[in-house]
Each structure stands twice: as C-alpha cells, then as structure tokens.
C-alpha cells in the first residue's frame, strides 16, 4: 500500500532533488510545535513508515494528539532506524536467527528470508574479565585469555556477520558498546535510500539510553524484541508521558558529572518515572558537554524511565565535529533537524514544548556523592558515607542493612599478602575499578582521575597492594588522551593499568580476588567494599565477596583506593601519610574544573577519534585470524557447550492453538520486592556446586573453563540451570539468601533447577509469586527464556519493569499483576497453595482474570498484555513463533 503521507516528502536541498525528507510542518497542525522533541521523533517514524497495516493513519493522529492520549494507555508502533547488540545478548540473538532459519526451512519456507532488514551492529565487549591487573602486560594477558575461552562464540559471531545481511560486528578489544555507539556508530540523521530521517535505535542492553545524550532516541529492549525489530516488525509501545526535567544554574567547581547523575537518579526515583520518557530542557543543559549529557542518559534505567532525551543543539553539532565526523554530513544533520523542527536552543524558552509534568534541579545544589551500598538510587553525600556505612552495618538485612551485631562492628582480620601483614575490617576497600561506559566516555572525569593520580603520587601516596585496582576504558580514545596528556604513568603507579576495553567489573567480570583476601573476608565474616565508576551495584553483581558496593566518580574511586576504607571522613581525616610523615588530605590533591578543562581542550582532539575508529574493524589480529564457516544454515556441533540449537521451535506447526487455562499450578518461588534480572538470570561466575557446573563437569570441563553465565547464553541447557541461580536470591520459602527452593510435594530443599525438573517430570505447571518492580535491571532476555524452560507458566507480581514484562510476553509466559491495593500479604497467600488461572478464549489487553486456590479462595489479577500486538504474540506462543509462521507462509 502507498504511504498516505507521501505528499509530505520534499528535497532538503534543491540542488539534490533525489534526496528527500518528510516535512512534518506540511501537516499544518499546530499540535506538532507543542509536542516534546522526543515525541516528534516517534511521529516522524510513524509518518515515514505508514502503510495502513503495521503503522496506520490513526496511529499518527494519536501521536499528534499526545497531550490527551498520553493519559489513555494508547498503543503506538515505533520502527527504530537500527539495532545495537552486545555479545552476551548478541550471541543468543544470532543463535535464535540460526534456529529460526532451520524452523522456516522445516515448515517449507525460504530460510534466507530470516535476515535483519535494518542495520544491526554487534559490539563484543562483555566477554573480557579482570584476571590480570597491576602489571604492564595486564591488557594483553586478559585479551589472550578472553580469546582462549571464547573462541567458539567468536567464530559463531563471525559466521553470523557473513551469513546475515546488514549485520556488522565490532571485534573484541574495541571498547564498550554505548561508548562506541556515541563516538562512532551514531548517525544522528540517516541519509539512506534517497531519504533523510532521524537516527533512532533499540539495543539489547538497558544502558542503550546513553545515546539519548546526543539527541538520538534509543532505549534498551530484550533480545527477543530486538530480533523482531531486525525482522522488520515495529515495537508496540504505550504512548509515554514525558517528564520535563529543567536544569538551571552552574555546578560547583569540585562537582563531577557523576555527582550530577547520582543526584538526578535519586531525584527521579522519588518522582516516579517508570515507563515514561524524561526530556531535559532549561538553560542549565547548555552548561553540560555531550559527555556529561551522555552520562546522565546512561543511567536512565537506574531511575526507571524508558528514555532520557537531550534534543540536538549546537553543543551536539560541535561534538560530532570533535569526534571526527565528516563536516559535510554534519552540515546536513543540522539543516535537516532545523527544517523538521527538531533542533533545540536551550536558552530560548519559547521553544520549550508541553510536558506531562515539570521537575527542576539547580545544578549549584549538587554535592560530591556516591551511591550504595546495594542500589544505584541510594545516593549518599561523600561527607556522610562513613556515618551511612556504619548505620547500614547494624541495620536489618535489606537495601540499607547488613545486620551485623553491634559488638562485631569493629571486627577485623589480619592476613599475609606478598610476605607483608595487612588488616581488613568492615568497610575495607578490596576492589577499586574505573570502569563502565557511564564514566569512561567522559573525558572530564577521566582526566580528573588522571590529574588526581598525578598529585597523589607526587604527594607520596600509594594504594595497598591487595586492593584489586583496574582501569577498563570504553574506547581506545581514552587511553590515547590519558597517554598524550601525561597522566597514564601516574595511574599505573597507583595500580590503575589498562586491563581491557570492555564492561569488565561493571557487569561482574571483576575476576578473582587474591586468595588471602577472600579467606580474611570469609573467616572474619566482613562486609568488604567495592568502589566502582559503574552504573549498577546490586548485591552479588560486582563480586560475590563484596557485600557493599558504591558507585562513585573515577577520581573518588582512586581516593577510596588510597584510603583503603569507606569509613573515613575526607574533611577531617587524611587520605594517608607520606614517607616524610606529612598528612595528605583529599582537598590537597583534588583537581579543579578549570585545571581539567584546560587539559581536555589541549588533548581531546578530532584526529585521535579518526585514528582510533578508522581501523576499528581490522585492528584485532586474533579476530582477523578466526576461521568461520560460510554456509547460510549453521552446522550445529552437538559437542559444543557454548552454542546449541534451542528447543523453542521443536514442536512448532503452522496452526495456532487456543490458549489454555493453568490448572493446579505449584509455586516454584515466593519472592519479595526488587527482584532483578540479575537474580533471575545471573551473568557472572558459575558457582562450582551449581546445576550448571554439574552439567559442564559431566561434559569433561574443569572449573577453570566454566567461564561466566553471560558467555554461555548460546546454550539453553546451561541457561536453564542458571535460572534463579544467584546466591543472593531471597526466597520466602527458605528465609535466607540461596539459589534454592522447597519442592512442595516432598518438602525437600533443592536447587531451583532441580526442583523445577521434578515438577516438569510429574507434568505439574508452575508459577512464581513476587512483589514490586519484578524484573528490574538489565534488559536480559534469558530472564524470560530461562523461566519458560523451567516450566513457569505465569508470574504474579505487584508491578513489573517494562522491558522484562515485554520479554515474558515474548516468550509466552503470562505476567499477572495484583489489583491496586492488593498484595500476596493482603490476600493471605503463603505460596503453598495450588493455583488455577482461568484464561478465556477471547482475550483483551489488560484484562482481569479469575484465580482460584485449592483452599477455595478466589481473587482477580490483571493480565499484563498491554497491547493487541502483545496478545497476537501470546496466541502464537511468543514473538519468535509469530515471526517464523509469518516467514514460512
């Protein structure tokens, strides 16, 4: 069908009549000029892709009518311009694509129809671990080990880049996906097939929102949704409310962008922005560099919004020039955005659009801070950290509590390391990592850390040798400017050598701690601390032996590493005493904003971006040497423990089955609030006594070769065994943290997988009970695929994180939500009942269903199928089944 809005297309430049754009001003609709800039991007995509099938004229009217429709939970389609993936989520996506080709062939279709129809960039950044640190060859040794362990996965990805059109792989060692996206992949405006249109994307990583800082609308989705977008399906989303976040004033000279983002995170958590867009405006925005904006946008999942948008302005255009983008392209970007009403001047309040609600922050009120000890939204001023940690020590087990008895608060343990004696206590820092795209993309905080290191070394300070220090930049550009500016040797002297280019400590790839340190922590039952410049510090994520983890700016990471403890008041106590007996305070070595900016102006230059990125796809010799098969259908190796054909499509036929009620289901797990996708499907180490470890041992592997759960996401047998295998999982059936549950028919306590297997062998369906914010954290598709493989038919929770809810639907698992004001406690549910959930044949979005217990009690819950499209996926047994049936016909 012809696009009903084709008449809006006109040339941007009369000298190039073949290159057109959809001029939304020709809609001659006064509502357009009042729309938030982020909603204008949704509108343009709908107008350009309107076909009266996937995108209808009524959708465009609904978006234009945003001021009214934002309150009505109206569903709109969005076709992003591209998709980005990292390797932990990218491997299972390519596995699914390979299995879908097999399934289409089996159903009599053409397997080569399964191909990305939009650009898909996969950046390998999640596999490298900090095994070696504090040595000049750390980088090479970690990269060699990464290749040795992941060769099979990398060969598979290389096969994928050759077998599928439109798929580009950025090799390992290049950097972190979101930083590479910001510095290199982002187009800001596409110039393709004779048409200009805004760059937009979804990514299989929740911190995809970082690109919103450059004015490119994007957010994280589950791997399952991303696969559908790659196959040409729009994302079906509820038209979001947009919170206007007004920034005013100027930050204090000692405040970093990290302090600003941690302040905003806490503030927006309190406002409540889940499922909404946040759009930044006000004169304060012009004070922020693109790196600062990207840092704020990066932590969007931590404050719970879907996107955190900074419209494009002159600062964005200057950044494109600074990062070596072609000047001619940059001119067209500005010209297009001005023509279509998407270019912003933050000092001109007449451009301010309508918002659902406006909240404000005066940047001069921001103080240096950290977040912790267990959640990114728990901001604590640096001046309060010592007091806060001590109150957490004694407080009841929880987000702000470790429940250490008062007479044990001063416990300590001595140990020998490298022939010297050291002492650890509660609050001792054992990991200090400058890591994560959140901060390493920001030259001001990275150079701030470098200058602080220089002053610390010159003042005679050092870091104790047992502290696991590391520096893992998000791109080669960082190393380039740290080296050129002369601060690199000082960072190395304090133990912050470059250990790899990847996510590393931020995602739990922190590697092992020295054995004597682990023994001291476990024997002393100590609350040891990790300090990192990352974006998440959920319990059990950073390292199993650091029960407290604080997010901090890179300079503060170094400061706490030198202090060796978080139980310090930097105002009153020195960081350390040098060889001359002089006390050195933090204020003596903290660099000012002016000092940092002077170095940044001199050393962060376009030439360095061009030099690093023009060879990014060819510079890794190990990658270039990999052999990969050339067939279009993948030849599965039955002996592989990394890549396995998944069972999702084995019994798939072309015919649809009517939905079935869930009868007499047992509760596999009875969980509380804030169960993260890390709890459901951990990404870190595979514990030696776990079901996944037994599976690998039975196949002849030793613990050294187990690798991490994240690296094994191409193997469903391991991932099913890793589901709910987080050691910090708190199950009400047990009243303790353990990856275990009670098998209700026998009363035995078993590993979660073993219990689920018993239920499945007996043909018994399962459900999970949970509290608020179920599935918060990473957009991890295995947190939905894993429960599906365990035989879980539904989850009953008080509320869900948006991405996880869609992922459950995408796998055919029913997300049920208690009615407002009701909870498991208010209904008197113990989880030991059996549940029958009546599923009617004709379903509607957000329909109420009847739940009956074997005790005779009945109550209602809402089925969280929010859109008609989600219902279609459910009827098909999931989104991928729907796509296969479509491609096979």
From Swiss-Prot:
GO terms for cellular component: cytoplasm; cytosol; endoplasmic reticulum; Golgi apparatus; mitochondrion. Belongs to the aconitase/IPM isomerase family. Its EC number is 4.2.1.3. It catalyses: citrate = D-threo-isocitrate. SUPFAM superfamilies: Aconitase iron-sulfur domain, LeuD/IlvD-like. Bifunctional iron sensor that switches between 2 activities depending on iron availability. Iron deprivation, promotes its mRNA binding activity through which it regulates the expression of genes involved in iron uptake, sequestration and utilization. Binds to iron-responsive elements (IRES) in the untranslated region of target mRNAs preventing for instance the translation of ferritin and aminolevulinic acid synthase and stabilizing the transferrin receptor mRNA. Conversely, when cellular iron levels are high, binds a 4Fe-4S cluster which precludes RNA binding activity and promotes the aconitase activity, the isomerization of citrate to isocitrate via cis-aconitate. The gene is Aco1. Interacts (when associated with the 4Fe-4S) with FBXL5. Interacts with frataxin(81-210). This is Cytoplasmic aconitate hydratase. It comes from Rattus norvegicus (Rat). Signal peptide: none annotated. Its main location: cytoplasm.
């Amino acid at each position: 069908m012809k696009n009903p809005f084709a008449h809006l297309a006109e040339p941007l430049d009369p000298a190039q009549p073949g290159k057109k754009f959809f001029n939304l001003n020709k809609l001659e609709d006064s509502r357009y000029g009042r729309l938030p800039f982020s909603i204008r991007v949704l509108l343009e995509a709908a107008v350009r892709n309107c076909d009266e099938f996937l995108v209808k004229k009524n959708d465009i009217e609904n978006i234009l009518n945003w001021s009214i429709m934002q309150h009505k939970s109206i569903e709109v389609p969005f076709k992003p311009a591209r998709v980005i993936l990292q390797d932990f989520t990218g491997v299972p996506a390519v596995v699914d694509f390979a299995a879908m080709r097999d399934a289409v062939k089996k159903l009599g279709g053409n397997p080569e129809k399964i191909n990305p129809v939009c650009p898909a960039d996969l950046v390998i950044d999640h596999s490298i671990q900090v095994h070696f640190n504090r040595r000049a060859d750390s980088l090479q040794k970690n990269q060699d080990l990464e290749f040795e362990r992941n060769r099979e996965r990398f060969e598979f990805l290389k096969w994928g880049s050759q077998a599928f059109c439109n798929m580009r792989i950025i090799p390992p060692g290049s950097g972190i996906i979101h930083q590479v996206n910001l510095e290199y992949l982002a187009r800001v405006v596409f110039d393709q097939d004779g048409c200009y249109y805004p760059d937009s994307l979804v990514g299989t990583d929740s911190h995809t929102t970082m690109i919103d800082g450059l004015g490119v609308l994007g957010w994280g989705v589950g791997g399952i949704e991303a696969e559908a977008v790659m196959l040409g399906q729009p994302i079906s989303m509820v038209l979001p409310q947009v919170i206007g976040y007004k920034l005013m004033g100027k930050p204090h000279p000692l405040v970093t962008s990290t302090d600003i983002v941690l302040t905003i995170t806490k503030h927006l958590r309190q406002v409540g922005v889940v499922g909404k867009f946040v759009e930044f405006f006000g004169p304060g925005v012009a004070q922020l560099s693109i790196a600062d904006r990207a840092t704020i946008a990066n932590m969007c999942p931590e404050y719970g919004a879907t996107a955190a948008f900074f419209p494009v302005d002159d600062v964005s255009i200057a950044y494109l020039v600074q990062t070596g983008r072609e000047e001619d392209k940059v001119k067209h970007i500005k010209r297009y955005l001005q023509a279509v009403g998407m270019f912003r001047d933050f000092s001109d309040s007449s451009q301010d659009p309508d918002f659902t609600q406006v909240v404000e922050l005066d940047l001069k009120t921001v103080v240096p801070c950290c977040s912790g000890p267990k959640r990114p939204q728990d901001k604590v001023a640096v001046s309060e950290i010592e007091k806060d940690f001590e109150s957490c020590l004694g407080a009841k087990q929880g987000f702000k509590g470790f429940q250490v008895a008062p007479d044990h608060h001063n416990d300590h343990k001595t140990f020998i390391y490298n022939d010297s004696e050291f002492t650890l206590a509660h609050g001792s820092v054992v990991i200090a990592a400058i890591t994560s795209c959140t901060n390493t993309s920001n030259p001001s905080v990275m150079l701030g850390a470098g200058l602080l290191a220089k002053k610390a070394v010159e003042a005679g300070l050092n870091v104790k040798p047992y502290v696991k220090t590391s520096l893992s930049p998000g791109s080669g550009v960082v190393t380039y400017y740290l080296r050129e500016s002369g601060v690199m040797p000082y960072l190395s002297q304090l133990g912050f050598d470059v250990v790899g280019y990847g996510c590393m400590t931020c995602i739990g790839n922190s590697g092992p701690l020295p054995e004597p340190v682990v023994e001291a922590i476990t024997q002393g039952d100590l609350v040891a601390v990790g300090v990192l410049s990352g974006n998440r510090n959920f319990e059990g994520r950073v390292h199993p032996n650091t029960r407290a983890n604080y997010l901090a700016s890179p300079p503060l990471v170094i400061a706490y590493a030198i202090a060796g403890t978080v139980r310090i008041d930097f105002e009153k106590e020195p960081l350390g005493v040098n060889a001359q007996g002089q006390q050195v305070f933090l204020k003596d070595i903290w660099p000012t904003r002016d000092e940092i900016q002077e170095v940044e102006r001199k050393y962060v230059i376009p030439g360095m971006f061009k030099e690093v990125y023009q060879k990014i796809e060819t510079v890794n010799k190990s990658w270039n040497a990999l052999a990969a098969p050339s067939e279009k259908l993948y030849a599965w190796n039955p002996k592989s423990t990394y890549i396995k054909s998944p069972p999702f499509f084995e019994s798939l036929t072309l015919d649809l089955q009517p939905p079935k009620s869930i009868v007499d289901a047992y509760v596999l797990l009875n969980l509380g609030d804030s169960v993260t996708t890390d709890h459901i499907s951990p990404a870190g180490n595979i514990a030696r006594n776990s079901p996944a470890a037994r599976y690998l041992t039975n196949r002849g592997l030793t613990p050294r070769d187990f690798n991490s759960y994240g690296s094994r996401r191409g193997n469903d047998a391991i991932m099913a065994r890793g589901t709910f295998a987080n050691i910090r999982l708190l199950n009400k059936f047990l009243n303790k943290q353990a990856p275990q549950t009670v098998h209700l028919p026998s009363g035995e306590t078993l590993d979660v997988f073993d219990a689920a297997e018993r239920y499945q062998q007996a043909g018994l369906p399962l459900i999970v009970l949970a509290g608020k914010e179920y599935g918060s954290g990473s957009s991890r598709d295995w947190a939905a695929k894993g429960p599906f493989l365990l035989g879980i038919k539904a989850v009953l929770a008080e509320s869900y994180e948006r991405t996880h809810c869609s992922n459950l639907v995408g796998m055919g698992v029913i997300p049920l939500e208690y009615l407002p004001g009701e909870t498991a406690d208010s209904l008197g549910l113990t989880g030991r009942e059996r549940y029958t959930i009546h599923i009617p044949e004709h379903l509607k979005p957000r329909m109420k269903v009847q739940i009956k217990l074997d005790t005779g009690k009945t109550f209602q819950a809402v089925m969280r199928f929010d859109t008609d499209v989600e219902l279609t996926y459910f009827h098909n047994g999931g989104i991928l089944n729907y796509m296969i049936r479509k491609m096979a016909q």
